Amino acid sequence: MSDILFVSIGAILGANIRFQIHHKLGNLNLDKGFLILIINTFASFGLGLFLSLVEQFRAFTYSYQLILFFSIGFFGSLSTFSSFVYDLFDLCLQLELFRALKLFIISVSIGIIAFAFGLFLGTQ
């Protein structure tokens, strides 16, 4: 039961931070797809950094709970995969297949690069 609590608290924090970032960046009149890309890139980087740093805490008694809190709860909630999929679907419905493919390739590529960069920074 306590594992669910760690995931839930992390998810609450991640969702609220995502909301705040989206709200603040939305005031800049950026494209919705670009906002989602920024948030997902940040979450991917943070997850990579966290997972590289968590290795240093393996001996720590609560390392498993930290993993639940951050990797599943916080970063899982911070990223906006469902919004990303919705944008792809919406572009396909509008027959904007090239834009959908471009969004897919850019988002996945940047997400992987951001994750790897976070992982790399954490091991330095």
From Swiss-Prot:
It holds the Pfam family CRCB. It is found in: Cell inner membrane. It is a multi-pass membrane protein. Na(+) is not transported, but it plays an essential structural role and its presence is essential for fluoride channel function. Belongs to the fluoride channel Fluc/FEX (TC 1.A.43) family. GO terms for cellular component: plasma membrane. One of its GO terms (molecular function) is fluoride channel activity. This is Fluoride-specific ion channel FluC 2. The chain crosses the membrane at residues 1-21, 34-54, 66-86, 103-123. Fluoride-specific ion channel. Important for reducing fluoride concentration in the cell, thus reducing its toxicity. GO terms for biological process: cellular detoxification of fluoride. Na(+) binds at residues 76, 79. It catalyses: fluoride(in) = fluoride(out). Keywords: Cell inner membrane, Cell membrane, Ion channel, Ion transport, Membrane, Metal-binding, Sodium, Transmembrane, Transmembrane helix, Transport. Coiled coil: none annotated. It comes from the Bacteria. The keyword Membrane applies. The lineage of its organism: Bacteria, Bacillati, Cyanobacteriota, Cyanophyceae, Synechococcales. The keyword Protein transport does not apply. Its main location: membrane.
